[in-house]
């Protein structure tokens, strides 16, 4: 098995989470289990309660494509006001937090995750 494939398999087993924290807005967390079950905590709603294995696999592939494992664990984007909340994405055991919108690879994964669960 290739190293990238092993990492992708590990990420798929552990699932995903995304959310918002800090700032002056209520935090939330959305969790996508490896089996596709979607759970929500906080003031948001997910339009899907379960993703198919194909959808989970596509998210795992995207995480690999954006090289999620190489993103810095914490980024404070220049010019972002302190009262703006930070967002986070967890893939497997690795969590990345970003305050602002200065990392396009992170933003691409964030948007894919929110679209997959139909976050509102």
Describe these PLM feature segments.
Residues 29-47:
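Short, flexible N-terminal segments of the mature chain
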Residues 24-26, 41-43, 92-94:
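Short strand-coil-strand connectors
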């Amino acid at each position: 098995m290739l190293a990238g494939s092993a990492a992708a398999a590990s990420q798929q087993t552990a699932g995903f989470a995304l959310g918002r924290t800090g700032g002056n807005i209520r935090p939330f967390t959305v969790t996508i289990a490896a089996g596709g079950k979607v759970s929500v905590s906080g003031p948001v709603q997910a339009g899907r309660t379960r993703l198919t294995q194909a959808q989970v696999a596509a998210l795992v592939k995207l995480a690999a494509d954006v090289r999620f494992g190489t993103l810095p664990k914490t980024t404070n984007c220049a010019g972002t006001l302190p009262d703006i909340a930070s967002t986070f994405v967890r893939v497997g055991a690795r969590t990345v937090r970003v305050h602002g919108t200065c990392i396009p690879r992170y933003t691409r994964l964030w948007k894919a995750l929110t679209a997959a669960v139909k976050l509102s």
